[in-house]
């Protein structure tokens, strides 16, 4: 009987040790996962998620949607939200999410070292992952003086030659918000009114539509994000190559504040159930491998290191280093200025 009790005790001990092992941090790492809410829908991103899982064993559960819809969803889910990370485009949207209380502060020496201060929230609530520059694009054979800065687009020589997107477009809102911050509201108002006077047509279409309009001669100059140019440059379609051949690109304000840039970025959510994995994931997206893939796969500028792929052909440029959070802080003011200027 004593031997049987001893055997039973050993069995119970082994069972208890196994149960404790399954509850240990090591076990949670091997079975870890994170829930990502993303407004980016690029094959490049999907490849990164798969690579992250292969390297860490952490499964990425992806929920996709529009930026505003995802923000509203997280707010509606409240403390029970399964979201660990929100990724979205435009610093203004990231600022709005932070103002709504969606994010939590992240203290990461890795992110502090990799992400410049002007490309992250002042309180480390969100971090830039990739960049795009808003450049001036002109038709090479237009015969007009090549503009050197955004303010040049208000000059009378460009009367009826400027094509633009709608004022409600988030990239135009952030551009104007940046101008408000760096030049003041009065100067920003004059700029918006001057550009409206030079419109070749009613604002319409996306950035690619503006590029095609310039190439066709419908207008002579526009502004566009560099990754739209990169897509056309990387295209094998002869029609796209013909468009690119007719276009010239200017990085504005190289003798002054620098060219306006915007970002895609990520923040760890306030009630993230998998906080450690979420921070590890954001750090991974700023790694050399991930940054190179952003550049080569989606024609974006990396936060870390130099550009590669088609957009590298555009050359280096000076960036406006106003903190990207400004785009959100000044957005309401930008809306009012556009409205007063008649920019629809």
Residue locations for each model-derived region?
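Short helix-loop capping/hinge motifs at secondary-structure junctions, enriched
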Residues: 141-148, 180-189, 272-278
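Ligand-binding pocket segment of bilobal, Venus flytrap-like solute-binding proteins
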Residues: 178, 182-252
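Short beta-strand->loop
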Residues: 37-40, 122, 138-140, 145, ...
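An extracytoplasmic/periplasmic, membrane-proximal ligand-sensing/linker region
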Residues: 188, 299-344
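A structural signal for short loop-to-beta-strand junctions that line the ligand-binding cleft
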Residues: 81-86, 104-136, 151, 163-164
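A bilobed periplasmic-binding-protein/Venus flytrap-type ligand-binding module shared by bacterial periplasmic
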Residues: 135-142, 261-274, 293
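Periplasmic-binding protein-like
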Residues: 160-168, 284-307
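Early extracytoplasmic/lumenal segment of secretory-pathway proteins
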Residues: 32-96
